[in-house]
Amino acid sequence: MKKLIRKIASAAIGISMVAVASQAMAQDSSKPIVIPTHNWSSQVVMAYVIGGIFESMGSNVEYVPADSQAVYESIRNGDVTISHEVWQGTFGKSFYNAMAKGGVIDAGTHAAATLEELGVPHYVIENNLCPGLPNWEALKNCPEIFATADSGGKGRVLEGPQSWHGELMPNRFKALGLDSNYVIKFAGSADAIWAELASAKKEGRGIITFNWSPNFTDADGFDFIEFPEYTDGCRIADGGDGACGSPKGWLKKAANYKFPKTHPAAYTTFSKMSFTTKDIGQMAALVDIDKMSHEDAAKKWLADNENVWKSFTQIGR
């Protein structure tokens, strides 16, 4: 009987030691979590929001500027830890290509649905500057409404930075027979798009520009042009002719495959993060409308929305 008791006691001690060891192994690493920053406001503010959440949990954080397409290779190689705004339409292919090579994992999907498309400020439609909009065929009859000093008499279409979509929009306009009356110009940054939108609004002139939702413009009055419906394979890169619009899509999160092991608590929190259209629009508006710095915008958003983000940190709930 005494031997049995000793065996049970020894087993209990062993289990306790394993449990303690497991807890020690489960401690998040002191190695910094590397968060990338790109070139649009919500992404940068959210980087600092997420970094602030990680820091509140005791993690160390480092921010690095990164190319929005190449970042998935950086995650795969371990140079960057996460990506928190993986837009399906623009970055989905790069994301899945990196996953297929190994080293990148899908860390979940935000509540917000996305759309990345060309459009016009609402006053363009309200004032009937180009009758028939938002139907794309209206563009055939009013290129002069969108002409600028540098467009050679053609209508100008202001695309995002070329690194975002490459030749997607030029290919679309050619496939739809609009290229003879319109020229595609690439903006240097998201800020350049907002500056052009503000200038056009002040002057009351027509402007076609790339935009996306969720964004601060959701509440500011912006209408997306209704191009032919997107179908799988319609884009040139997928074997089609390019005569289609953009799909509505998801907004995902990506992480290096080692993140769950090196920072189990931070990864669990990251996997639970799910921001809404309203959340993301607020983050962008603090910079693009209220003119705050990205860092200050993140601090304000965190202070104003503790009820949102603290739930992400409650492990096991």
Enumerate the language-model features and the residues they cover:
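Immediate post-signal peptide segment of exported/extracytoplasmic ligand-binding proteins
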Residues: 24-34, 54-55, 146-154, 308-317
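Short helix-initiation/N-cap motifs at beta->coil->alpha
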Residues: 40-41, 59-76, 184-196
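Pocket-flanking alpha-helical
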Residues: 47, 66-102, 196, 216-221
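A bilobed periplasmic-binding-protein/Venus flytrap-type ligand-binding module shared by bacterial periplasmic
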Residues: 116-128, 248-262, 285-286
